[in-house]
Amino acid sequence: QEIKTLEAVRNPNVNYRHSVVSNNFEKIPGMPIAYWVSKRIIDIIEQSQKMGDVVEAKQGCATANNNKYLRLWHEVEFDKIGFNYVSNYDAKHSNKIWFPYNKGGSFRKWYGNREFVVFWKRGGIDLFNDPKAVVRNSGYYFKESVSWSDVTSSKNSFRYYNKGFIFDSTGHSVFPNKNISANKLLAVCNNKFFEMMI
């Protein structure tokens, strides 16, 4: 191995030497040392709109006590679950106690991981008042989103969540702006090129 390495340093024409222009790494968001990226991919990255220009990525709620605040949807009275609410204001002023909860989960591409509901009576006042809980980005609760789990054993998988879900700290979510639909965003996130780039 040492002899081949020395030969590759001395002779740029050996067939096992791979050279890249280091300035190209600066063109890739986050500047990873991605020696495998071709000129064509660099060109696509340079010409493409940045993800941060069309979405807002947010992390959600951490209950700090899932046994107290979370249930599987079939464990509670069905008529106490608030489906399809579009804002925390509407949820707070309803007679509903439990609301759909995006907690992430196993590999599910396009759709899925919708098993949980969260105790969110009167707009989640118990969670807001719990000193151990962290309620992040509540202004984004109940909005349409694309989500993925923070822990995965294989490739990332992105899923669609319609309006009406509160999201967890492990069910990361992105919220499309008016320049892209959630369905188009989902298609982009689940395609092979995007998978290769992340």
Regions found by a protein language model. Name each.
Residues 149-198:
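Basic, amphipathic alpha-helical recognition segments used for DNA target recognition
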Residues 1-129, 134-145, 151:
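Polynucleotide-recognition surfaces of large bacterial nucleic-acid defense/processing enzymes
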